[in-house]
Amino acid sequence: MSSKFIIDSMLPKYHQQFHHQQLFQSATTEAPAAYSSSSPSGSSPQHSSSSASTSPAARMYPYVSAAHHHHQAAAAAFGAAASGSMVPSFSSTASSALAAAVDAATDKSCRYTAGLAANVTPADSMVNYTLGQHHHNGAAVSAASSVSAASASMAVAAQFYHQAASAVVDPLNSCSQPAAPGGQPIPDIPRYPWMSITDWMSPFDRVVCGPNGCPRRRGRQTYTRFQTLELEKEFHFNHYLTRRRRIEIAHALCLTERQIKIWFQNRRMKLKKELRAVKEINEQARREREEQERHKQQQQEKQQKIEQQTHSSIHQHHHDPMKMSLDKSGGSDLLKAVSKVPT
């Protein structure tokens, strides 16, 4: 929930009634002030005569009272247009003031640009916003000039955000490129597809809220090929850096010490994972090799058993005919001996 909604809920009810009463009073009191502000002394928003009529509620709640200020500006412009018969040369200026008031009422995206155009700190932009609205009520000429100043300040702010985003996304190029002589703008650095996400975003919009309302972590740091190559070279010789060496590398690569330290931590963790993966692969290969050797040994044992069985069967068949021949010869000798027995 933004601060604007909190202020809307805290705003007292009599504040709107007070401004509705002032709406009809300003139609008669702001017209002479518009004529008196045509002098050089009344053209500045800080010394405008209408700034004295700022209500305390408008000082406390400048965002909520903006709509009432726009109504006051429209009423003042109508009053000036009605009295155009007294000063004929001011009628065209009053119509331009009316158009500027309507444009300011419809376009609320320039509420912070008045402070940037006047080289004022962002803390005073809230006060300058209320003074700018009273300046629309009091001075018609400065109203048209403030619209052009607001558009110019928007361009300046966009260029500032573009340079800030470029410096954050690519610190190497922002560090290595010196300022151009003669006050000329530095040429744009090459933009890559992954850098265009935060190109035209303000620093406040770059904070992304998560689903539970908490801000998410910042995006990962992108390193160039040169930076990655130098870091890999250093990691090849030293897995751990000393403080002095870390400072030297950070200065040489236009990075911070924290980025160097985090990169080396991640690289050591990556090496540890790679070694663990290689160890697991070697262990799996060793198991497969042992399994193959065991299977081969079992096959050899089976083959040896089969060979032994075949050899024993062949040897047994070779001894059986010899035994049968011996039995036959023994039987014939026994018959001969029996036949020779005397009677």
Curated annotation (Swiss-Prot):
GO function terms (MF aspect): DNA binding; DNA-binding transcription factor activity, RNA polymerase II-specific
A Pfam short name: Abdominal-A
DNA-binding region(s) from the entry: 216-275
Keyword Signal: no
Annotated InterPro entries: Abdominal-A (IPR022132), Antp_homeobox (IPR050296), HD (IPR001356), HD_metazoa (IPR020479), Homeobox_CS (IPR017970), Homeodomain-like_sf (IPR009057)
Primary subcellular site in the record, as a coarse category: nucleus
Protein's cellular compartments: Nucleus
CDD domains recorded: homeodomain
Region (Disordered): 29-54, 286-343
Gene Ontology CC terms, in alphabetical order: nucleus
Basic and acidic residues bias (residue ranges): 286-305
Record key words, sorted: Developmental protein, DNA-binding, Homeobox, Nucleus
Origin superkingdom: Eukaryota
Membership in a protein family: Belongs to the Antp homeobox family.
Main function: Sequence-specific transcription factor which is part of a developmental regulatory system that provides cells with specific positional identities on the anterior-posterior axis.
Name of this protein: Homeobox protein abdominal-A homolog
Species: Tribolium castaneum
